[in-house]
Amino acid sequence: MILSDKTILDYIKSSKIIVEPFDESSLQCSSLDLRLSNSIAFYEELDIIDIKSPIQAKTVTFEEYFIINPGEFLLASTMEYIKLPEFITAFVEGRSSLGRLGLFIENAGWVDAGFEGQITLELYNANKYPIKLYKGMRICQLVFAKLDEIPSKVYRGKYLCQKGATPSKIFMDFDKK
């Protein structure tokens, strides 16, 4: 069941869902707009990406804005730090207004029940023009859904409590035996 604005607000006010900082004007009828932080990360020139090995990414902070060039892929993060209870999951959706400019936001937009942290966004500029993005702008929407029952496993993965634009940790999947 997708949560309405009334339920989202009730859950935030009762601390069932944590959103810091919370801006009530970001609440939509069935979602919460999240804002762009000042942290981005990108992968520097590589011959090949070996997913079994840690991949170094350059993380930078910006004061007011950054420009994403045509065909460029980078990671960004939300300003908001969220914490979901064990009975709520969420979907990250790009904003239509940005999609209409050719900016693709996220390709891994699932937030598991029990997740805590800033959300890393995967950004890609499919336009033939550079796009200027500003710190604090509404960048994506978070749609909350209530699970039919408490799961036997809640999220305790490698991105728990992440802050800032967090590069891939897929190499850790290969360490599991």
From Swiss-Prot:
Marked site positions, Important for bifunctional activity: 109-110
Keyword hit for Cytoplasm: no
Family annotation (Pfam families): DCD
SUPFAM superfamilies, A to Z: dUTPase-like (SSF51283)
Catalytic activity reported: dCTP + 2 H2O = dUMP + NH4(+) + diphosphate
EC number, UniProt record: 3.5.4.30
UniProtKB keywords: Hydrolase, Nucleotide metabolism, Nucleotide-binding
Gene Ontology terms for molecular function: dCTP deaminase (dUMP-forming) activity; dCTP deaminase activity; nucleotide binding
Family: Belongs to the dCTP deaminase family.
Oligomer status and interactors: Homotrimer.
HAMAP family for this protein: dCTP_deaminase (MF_00146)
Protein name: dCTP deaminase, dUMP-forming
